[in-house]
Amino acid sequence: MDEGIPHLQERQLLEHRDFIGLDYSSLYMCKPKRSLKRDDTKDTYKLPHRLIEKKRRDRINECIAQLKDLLPEHLKLTTLGHLEKAVVLELTLKHLKALTALTEQQHQKIIALQNGERSLKSPVQADLDAFHSGFQTCAKEVLQYLARFESWTPREPRCAQLVSHLHAVATQLLTPQVPSGRGSGRAPCSAGAAAASGPERVARCVPVIQRTQPGTEPEHDTDTDSGYGGEAEQGRAAVKQEPPGDSSPAPKRPKLEARGALLGPEPALLGSLVALGGGAPFAQPAAAPFCLPFYLLSPSAAAYVQPWLDKSGLDKYLYPAAAAPFPLLYPGIPAAAAAAAAAAFPCLSSVLSPPPEKAGATAGAPFLAHEVAPPGPLRPQHAHSRTHLPRAVNPESSQEDATQPAKDAP
């Protein structure tokens, strides 16, 4: 049986030494899968884990920086200082929501127009929306130009002021104007224009009532609380711009009558006179008598101030005589200047003229050039002496002088 299988005998005769030096390529292909995977991914695991994390963080920072550059300028200026990553992501989310809402609104408008329906908004509101959109585009272009060519940064105060001003103007332009009735055209106060012009231009609008008496001729009005120059147009109200410092309108200066007028104290001088010990405030100036003394310096003593005295500036030397010890003309004015004051203010003649029953009491005192002196010799006056002429004038005596025009010689 063994003879029938010759190859079996030959296999049994083979020993281990017979296999030395033979090359079997199939033996090298039998490798485990784990070793093959390690060989293929050896280059991937060469870098440490911290370098991989650094690359990942760098990619995140690069994307956030690109988002920051793509954000509009008005969103960047809402936060002062450095924009953090979380702030950039929040602003990006806010901007995307606004764009989504705008896109949805435009899509609804397009569908409404395709279906033949009318616009959801009135034409005026649609125009305001279009203007607001164009205004925002122009403001964005201005900010980009300033940042590119003028080197403006969002951190600068002037850039923040410009954005605030543009936002105020856009807000006011979108506010609907309330129409005023009866044809009174009141000009609205522009908040944006007031913010741009500065503190000296900031003012409050005060409507001024027109003089509508029939038959009045237009004349130049010099009152301080008048909002127009005298030529008042019928049927239209004027608007006056007053400085913000005054909480009340400026008081009018009392006009002096030609005959029998009493000098009332100006309200602007009452505070200073009371503070200096001049007495109580003048609640009713016409009820109390006025003492009108004169302190006249000699021309030689007041020669150094005489070249600066002018008729137009004498009214600032007038003080109410009831606030003693202040005289009527203060500080001392020479006799020539007093005569000039009397000539500049003719209304003082009726006040300074003595009543008939008191003419004898002031016979020896010097009189001004425009008054009629009573009969009697005048006493000489020393060169450096003062002459005090106190005289009280009551409202009753002033009324009596007004009824006797012959005694008021100009």
Curated annotation (Swiss-Prot):
Cross-link Glycyl lysine isopeptide (Lys-Gly) (interchain with G-Cter in SUMO2) placement: 31, 121, 240
- A Pfam family in this protein? HLH
Q: For this protein, what is any one GO molecular function term? A: protein heterodimerization activity
Identify the residues that the record assigns to the bHLH domain, covering every copy. 44-99
| Region (Disordered) location | 209-255, 360-410
Q: What's a GO cellular component annotated to this UniProt protein? A: transcription repressor complex
Entry-linked CDD domains: bHLH-O_DEC2
**One GO BP annotation of this record:** negative regulation of myotube differentiation
Which subcellular locations apply to this protein? Nucleus
Keywords on record: Biological rhythms, DNA-binding, Isopeptide bond, Nucleus, Repressor, Transcription, Transcription regulation, Ubl conjugation
- Where does it mainly reside? nucleus
TM ranges: none
Expression by tissue: Expressed in skeletal muscle, brain and lung.
Q: Which PROSITE patterns does this UniProt record tie to the protein?
A: BHLH, ORANGE
* Induction context: Expressed in a circdadian manner in the liver with a peak at ZT10.
| Domain spans labelled Orange | 131-166
Subunit: Homodimer. Heterodimer with BHLHE40/DEC1. Interacts with CIART. Interacts with BMAL1. Interacts with RXRA. Interacts with NR0B2 and HNF1A.
The role this protein plays is: Transcriptional repressor involved in the regulation of the circadian rhythm by negatively regulating the activity of the clock genes and clock-controlled genes. Acts as the negative limb of a novel autoregulatory feedback loop (DEC loop) which differs from the one formed by the PER and CRY transcriptional repressors (PER/CRY loop). Both these loops are interlocked as it represses the expression of PER1 and in turn is repressed by PER1/2 and CRY1/2.
The protein's name is: Class E basic helix-loop-helix protein 41
User: Whose protein is this, by species?
Assistant: Mus musculus (Mouse)
